[in-house]
Swiss-Prot record:
This is Nuclear transcription factor Y subunit C-3. One of its GO terms (cellular component) is nucleus. It comes from Arabidopsis thaliana. GO terms for molecular function: DNA-binding transcription factor activity; protein heterodimerization activity; transcription cis-regulatory region binding; transcription coregulator activity. Belongs to the NFYC/HAP5 subunit family. The gene is NFYC3. Ubiquitous. It is found in: Nucleus. The keyword Nucleus applies.
Length: 217
């Protein structure tokens, strides 16, 4: 009885993030198999990202048609003009934004779909997008528009340290030791230069305390 009580007290006082991470991972003899499968999934994601960006670089180098785009340039130009400081926009600027938006959507979809397959589903859901956002530092600007419950579930779901190997490198950034893809001059930056996601595990807003309420009320 004393041992059981001590074990329960230890479990209750442990770090909740560690507890959730452990409960999502099979224990005992199944743990090596889970670790191997998870590692294979991350290696597959790394290969998919490399292939994706290699294809994007080749398409950019071969682009000759600057008039037809997947996204409407008029809409992009209208969004750009929402900034009151923007007076004039050249014809080339919306073209660059259209291509950038297209690549952004494609990569976010690729990362989200990876989470869909991890959960053995065939339909991409909003929590898959939340997973892609929380696993990739460069997407931290999206935390304010990701549904809070999905973001919390993904953080508390125990994203393992291994998941950050491939999933944490955004926009053509490759893990250390990986050969560059495409034109060497087009490989962007160093992934190690990015700090950890400051929004990870933090609430997106805080409820005002009694001292912050309007004194008139």
């Amino acid at each position: 009885m004393d041992q059981q009580g001590q074990s329960s007290a230890m479990n209750y006082g442990s770090n909740p993030y560690q507890t959730n991470a452990m409960t999502t991972t099979p224990t005992g003899s199944d743990h090596p198999a889970y670790h191997q499968i998870h590692q294979q999934q991350q290696q597959q994601l790394t290969q998919q990202l490399q292939s994706f960006w290699e294809t994007q670089f080749k398409e950019i180098e071969k682009t000759t048609d600057f008039k037809n785009h997947s996204l409407p340039l008029a809409r992009i130009k209208k969004i750009m003009k929402a900034d009151e400081d923007v007076r004039m926009i050249s014809a080339e600027a919306p073209v660059v934004f259209a291509r950038a938006c297209e690549m952004f959507i494609l990569e976010l979809t690729l990362r989200s779909w990876n989470h869909t397959e991890e959960n053995k589903r065939r339909t991409l859901q909003k929590n898959d997008i939340a997973a892609a956002v929380t696993r990739t530092d460069i997407f931290d600007f999206l935390v304010d528009i990701v549904p809070r419950e999905d973001l919390r579930d993904e953080v508390l779901g125990g994203v393992g340290a291994e998941a950050a190997t491939a999933a944490g490198y955004p926009y053509g950034y490759l893990p250390p030791g990986t050969a560059p893809i495409g034109n060497p001059g087009m490989v962007m930056g160093n992934p190690g230069a990015y700090p950890p996601n400051p929004y990870m595990g933090q609430p997106m807003w805080q409820q005002p305390g009694p001292e912050q309420q309007d004194p008139d009320n």
